Design a protein with these regions (language model features):
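Generic preference for hydrophobic
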Residues: 61, 77, 100-101, 207-209
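Catalytic core of membrane glycerolipid acyltransferases/transacylases, capturing the structured
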Residues: 21-45, 53-54, 69-129
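Membrane-interfacial terminal anchoring regions of lipid-handling membrane enzymes
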Residues: 1-29, 38, 42, 68, ...
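Active-site phosphate/pyrophosphate- and oxyanion-stabilizing loops and adjacent acidic/basic residues
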Residues: 49, 88, 172-173
């Protein structure tokens, strides 16, 4: 049954994504950058909604009040990264327009990448660390000044459940330099949509949003350790069996 459900979902994505991407590229000719984000975000909302009846994947959000308390502040979100699910869900579920930092190779994906290129995101060349750091710093400052929230995955890539990769300091460095608040997010999306897995597992993805962390008078190293400590401790709360 899971194979059938996952296959139906894949067929939906293969058919719907190119159609929506073409619609986006046409609509973007007449929309402001802010309205482009809203328009393309409808795809995310549809996908997240469809995953419930089709694959049995639901979600639960804990700590949303921590975001609503700082809606008018400069914020950098640092999130655990396990799955494609959270990258789709954040645009659909979070209350503020996000600016993702992502590898430029995503722009080369037919249809999806082409539409993505028309949004004000930060795409980096991960093979050149110096250039990537400069892009995050310069574009990040600009996007924060426009009122957007910056979204980064400090581990840099998706990690299997129960594992941790070294946290990179790019997001913490940007927060420290701009005096932005940092909101950490832990989740267990890898349980339902594992990395590199075609099969989608039914279950509930828990998103745990932490209290905003001040970057004032903190070095990037101090801030990074505080964020990592909160996320990894919270991971053991929402998914304890993964760490036994």
């Amino acid at each position: 049954m899971k194979l059938i459900r996952s296959t139906l979902f894949a067929i939906f994505l293969v058919i719907f994504t190119p159609i929506w991407s073409v619609l986006c590229m046409l609509a973007f000719l007449f929309l402001s950058p802010e309205n482009r984000y809203t328009f393309i975000g409808l795809w995310n909302k549809i996908v997240i909604a469809l995953l419930k009846p089709l694959c049995g994947i639901h979600y639960e959000i804990r700590g949303m009040e921590n975001m609503r308390a700082v809606l008018n502040e400069r914020v950098i979100i640092l999130s655990k990264h396990q799955s494609a699910y959270e990258t789709i869900a954040y645009i659909a579920l979070l209350p503020k327009q996000l600016c993702f930092v992502f590898k430029r190779e995503l722009l080369w994906i037919p249809f999806f990448g082409w539409a993505l290129a028309l949004l004000k995101m930060i795409h980096i060349n991960r093979s050149n660390k110096q250039t990537a750091a400069h892009s995050v710093a310069t574009q990040g400052r600009k996007r924060l000044s426009e009122g957007k929230w910056i979204m980064l995955f400090p581990e840099g890539t998706r990690t299997p459940i129960g594992s941790t990769k070294p946290y990179r300091k790019g997001g913490a460095r940007l927060a420290s330099a701009t005096d932005a608040l940092v909101i950490p997010i832990a989740h267990n999306a890898g349980r339902c949509w594992p990395k590199n897995s075609f099969i989608k597992e039914p279950g509930t993805v828990i998103f745990s949003i932490g209290p905003a962390i001040s970057s004032t008078n903190k070095s990037a190293e101090e801030l990074q350790r505080e964020v990592e400590g909160w996320i990894e401790a919270e991971m053991r709360v929402i998914d304890p069996s993964a760490y036994q």
